[in-house]
């Protein structure tokens, strides 16, 4: 009888992770993971009273802890596998402790029969107040000669003393003007005056107005002097036009990349020229070489290398990119016709040798976009705060004054010669040809209103039938007119549905032939 193979149980950690949520864990798994076994409890509660931290238990080194293995009743032990070392301090340690104890006074020894009561003596407490401060007075001698602002004392015999007190000198008044300036790199004050009437200084506007800004007729004739405009310093700055661009990164002639050893992208003898019309050539040219997924993070602005297996033939999305192994970064230039050209140099891997080398021709893929025109010069305005740009218009100054006599009114006679009836409007409104429009004039829908035969002659004009219809009931005593019916029978067709079929009248249906059955 074959013995059954023992299947090893899974690890305790993995079993605990899977069965803890379900509550089906074995007791031994829970005790081992949560450290609640008998040995764990002995270590937990026994470590409160016994410390075995320096013995190196369960370290696997066999050194016996910090003191080594010591037999009972002997001195310090020796570590296994090592020689004892004597540790000597480099400096002599100084004794740290209290001050030396003074000897007991033996002059007045205490007799054994003396009283043990010690009399109290008065002692002066510690003086906590500050001590006396020494004061030093500096005495300055009086100058011998007369000094400024010194009182003069005059003494005379037989009269009262007169004391002349000099007035107290008034110190000079100091006026301090401060101006705070905060530096703002985006704001710059231009201290400039444009040719205008007035004055300017820094950022403070000073406006000078006068009453000679208008035009006076009939007054004194003054001499008119032609003034010339004072050009500012910005007038002499001539901005040269931007030269037309020929490539995306213009390089000097001595650093030209495409001219070394006669190599050029437009050389038809060395490079195959292929014009691409697909717009993916500008953004994602790799989609023209092989089918791939979109990666919005990757920008195809570098050289793309495609690793294809030559044993397996894969049809590319575009036949012009067949067997392309490398597609370099784009280059921007201009054509002789003035168009922008995006070029990429590619390498084909058409032939592979036995050593693994791949041989292929070089292809110039390009697409012409548009032309690059020279920018028109734009007049730039000054940035910052400067005076002279604001135009202030005053009504009384800019008006025209006429010198005339107000007492005489030459128009009074001509006004009285005409009557007020000439101001009345004599136009006659005629509404005979008008029409009543119901609805909105902006509606573009056309509705056909059927015209019924009636004895009343009237015209209806309806422009929009989406409004409201108001019907007013009327009663007339008109005789009802009965029109004679024609001789042709009337065919009635019921059109209950809007399909393409119809129902015939029962009189028009084909009658069934009656037959008698024997």
Swiss-Prot record:
Chief site of localization: virion
Superkingdom in the source lineage: Viruses
Protein keywords: Capsid protein, Cytoplasmic inwards viral transport, Disulfide bond, DNA-binding, Host endosome, Host Golgi apparatus, Host nucleus, Host-virus interaction, Late protein, Microtubular inwards viral transport, Phosphoprotein, Viral penetration into host nucleus, Virion, Virus entry into host cell
Gene Ontology terms describing biological process: microtubule-dependent intracellular transport of viral material towards nucleus; symbiont entry into host cell; viral penetration into host nucleus
Disulfide bond entries: 19-25
Sequence motif Nuclear localization signal, residues: 1-10, 510-517
Any one GO molecular function term: structural molecule activity
Region ranges (Disordered): 238-260
InterPro entries xref list: Late_L2 (IPR000784)
Gene Ontology CC terms: host cell; host cell endosome; host cell Golgi apparatus; host cell nucleus; viral capsid
Pfam families named among the record's database cross-references: Late_protein_L2
Modification after translation, per record: Highly phosphorylated.
Biological role stated in the UniProt entry: Minor protein of the capsid that localizes along the inner surface of the virion, within the central cavities beneath the L1 pentamers. Plays a role in capsid stabilization through interaction with the major capsid protein L1. Once the virion enters the host cell, L2 escorts the genomic DNA into the nucleus by promoting escape from the endosomal compartments and traffic through the host Golgi network.
Recorded family membership: Belongs to the papillomaviridae L2 protein family.
Subunit structure: Interacts with major capsid protein L1. Interacts with E2; this interaction inhibits E2 transcriptional activity but not the DNA replication function E2. Interacts with host GADD45GIP1. Interacts with host HSPA8; this interaction is required for L2 nuclear translocation. Interacts with host importins KPNB2 and KPNB3. Forms a complex with importin alpha2-beta1 heterodimers via interaction with the importin alpha2 adapter. Interacts with host DYNLT1; this interaction is essential for virus intracellular transport during entry.
The name this protein goes by in its record: Minor capsid protein L2
Annotated source species: Human papillomavirus type 5b
